[in-house]
């Protein structure tokens, strides 16, 4: 279609397992194409495999789209003019289409077993693994009757036109498959149950899908779908053949596709670690597409404004965890402080044991201290947890203590404690001034030596939010209690030693 607003794309996952980042990337590109063109996104569910499909997986797909902020115009939950949008509820539609294909001669019954096909290949000197040989398309009535008398139940195969197949792929340009590579294929089982090879194009046809954007693994099946569309148009089911675009593989480590067994493939692992939706969407978009000018950080609005499926790269895209985290860090920094504070509080409440009763005014300050220091929301827990525990529950990280609480740290701790005891107005500027005078000016210590021991003393870690601000948040009593306890174990020694 030429009118951009007539664009209709679909996202049609199978509800098996947990949402894979490759699947979600496919959803994103379809969503971005629909939003960029002013078209519509149709969301339906391919749940015809009763043995593997589950309601839990279906809900997980819904949750993944909602978390990322991707909406749809027609489909499950929201409804639309082509209901139902779950294939398991459309079986009567598929059976009706199958009967029309039978009546028009586009499909035929095939009785050959896999063993018989292999034996015919061997007898002809061909590779026995070549696949179906189209033998049954010319069966006589007598042969069919004989098979029926044996009790055989046929599968139904689409009669593939004997010609080469060419089309202009939106991502890969001109594609050609030779006729010899496209045998007649099964569209319905021997029990009459329609297969994916039939139901998916039928749904696309009846729902007026104009662009099929899907994974590269489905590229070899395109000639079959083109042939089926020709038949569907003849019997009045399809009005047009959609354009196809095959999106690049998402690769994992090395040269392998990102497997479902790889933890990085699970979208929810990233959410649970503290990747925010803006960071995830930005990174997923980069798995095959990029904004002009090599700009890696962009908003959802910028993605929608600039997305062009013809600019998607055909080469495989490698999933890079470090790059995802770096992009996420940038998006965390772009959040308004109040927005970040609310998201961080919600995250820590859901995924950690950070106290829900920690004072709101203190949490707002703490959040501001870590917003520019974390890559994922989950990083904040390790930086902030020391603020919310009892002084006696603080434990020193062994590596940090061994490095920062040596004999040379004793003067810094003694002088620091003495200086802080004299601070009357417990504010960040007053704390900083007192410690700077006592440690840097009076003792002539380098800041790393002067403040390293104090940092470990109040937080248990060598890395924490800014020292003076952290002391203000802890309060004078807790700060001094922790530093005195640290002084008692300095120089620090591992118990086993």
UniProtKB/Swiss-Prot annotation:
CDD domains associated with the record: GluRS_core
Domain of life: Bacteria
Cellular location(s): Cytoplasm
GO CC terms, sorted: cytosol
InterPro entries referenced in this protein's UniProt entry, alphabetically: aa-tRNA-synth_I_cd-bd, aa-tRNA-synth_I_codon-bd_sub2, aa_tRNA-synth_I_cd-bd_sf, Glu-tRNA-ligase_bac/mito, Glu-tRNA-synth_I_codon-bd_sub1, Glu/Gln-tRNA-synth, Glu/Gln-tRNA-synth_Ib_cat-dom, GluQ/Sye
EC numbers on record: 6.1.1.17
Protein residues bound to ATP: 260
Keyword Cytoplasm set for record: yes
Keywords assigned: Aminoacyl-tRNA synthetase, ATP-binding, Cytoplasm, Ligase, Nucleotide-binding, Protein biosynthesis
Entries under Pfam families matching the protein: Anticodon_2, tRNA-synt_1c
Residue numbers covered by motif 'HIGH' region: 13-23
Task performed by this protein: Catalyzes the attachment of glutamate to tRNA(Glu) in a two-step reaction: glutamate is first activated by ATP to form Glu-AMP and then transferred to the acceptor end of tRNA(Glu).
NCBIfam families: gltX_bact (TIGR00464)
Assembly and oligomerization: Monomer.
Protein name: Glutamate--tRNA ligase
């Amino acid at each position: 279609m030429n009118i951009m607003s007539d664009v209709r794309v679909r996202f049609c996952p199978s509800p098996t397992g947990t949402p894979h980042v490759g699947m979600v990337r496919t959803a994103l590109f379809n969503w971005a194409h629909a939003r960029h063109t002013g078209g519509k996104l149709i969301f339906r569910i391919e749940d015809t495999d009763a043995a593997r499909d589950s309601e839990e997986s279906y809900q997980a797909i819904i949750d993944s789209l909602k978390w990322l902020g991707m909406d749809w115009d027609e489909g499950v939950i929201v409804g639309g003019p082509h209901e139902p949008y779950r294939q398991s509820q459309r079986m009567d539609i598929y059976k009706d289409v199958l009967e029309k294909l039978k009546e028009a001669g586009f499909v035929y019954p095939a009785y050959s077993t896999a063993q018989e096909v292999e034996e015919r290949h061997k007898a002809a000197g061909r590779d026995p693994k070549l696949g179906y040989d189209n033998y049954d398309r010319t069966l006589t009535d007598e042969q069919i009757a004989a098979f029926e008398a044996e009790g055989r139940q046929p599968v139904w195969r689409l009669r593939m036109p004997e010609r080469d197949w060419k089309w202009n792929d939106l991502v890969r340009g001109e594609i050609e498959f030779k006729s010899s590579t496209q045998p007649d294929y099964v569209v319905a089982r021997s029990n009459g149950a329609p297969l994916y090879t039939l139901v998916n194009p039928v749904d696309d046809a009846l729902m007026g899908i104009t662009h099929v954007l899907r994974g590269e693994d489905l590229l070899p099946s395109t000639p079959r779908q083109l042939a089926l569309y020709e038949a569907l148009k003849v019997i009045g089911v399809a009005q047009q053949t959609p354009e196809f675009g095959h999106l690049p593989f998402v690769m994992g480590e090395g040269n392998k596709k990102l497997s479902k067994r790889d933890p990085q493939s699970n979208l929810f692992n990233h959410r649970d670690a503290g990747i925010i939706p803006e960071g995830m969407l930005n990174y997923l978009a980069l798995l095959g597409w990029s904004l002009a000018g090599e700009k890696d950080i962009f908003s959802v609005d910028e993605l929608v404004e600039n997305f062009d499926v013809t600019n998607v790269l055909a080469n495989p895209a490698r999933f890079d965890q470090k790059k995802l985290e770096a992009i996420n860090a940038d998006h965390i920094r772009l959040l308004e402080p109040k927005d970040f504070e609310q998201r961080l509080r919600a995250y820590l409440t859901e995924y950690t044991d950070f106290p829900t009763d920690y004072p709101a005014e203190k949490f707002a300050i703490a959040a501001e201290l870590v917003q520019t220091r974390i890559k994922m929301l989950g990083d904040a827990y390790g930086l902030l947890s020391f603020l919310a525990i009892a002084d006696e529950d603080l434990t020193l990280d062994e590596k940090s203590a061994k490095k920062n609480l040596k004999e040379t740290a004793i003067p810094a701790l003694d002088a620091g404690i003495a200086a802080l005891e004299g601070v009357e107005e417990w504010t960040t500027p007053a704390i900083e001034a007192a410690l700077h005078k006592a440690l840097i000016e009076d003792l002539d210590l380098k800041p790393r030596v002067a403040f390293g021991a104090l940092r470990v003393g109040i937080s248990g870690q060598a890395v924490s939010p800014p020292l003076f601000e952290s002391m203000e948040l802890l309060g004078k009593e807790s700060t001094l209690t922790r530093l005195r306890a640290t002084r008692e174990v300095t120089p620090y020694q591992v118990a086993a030693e």
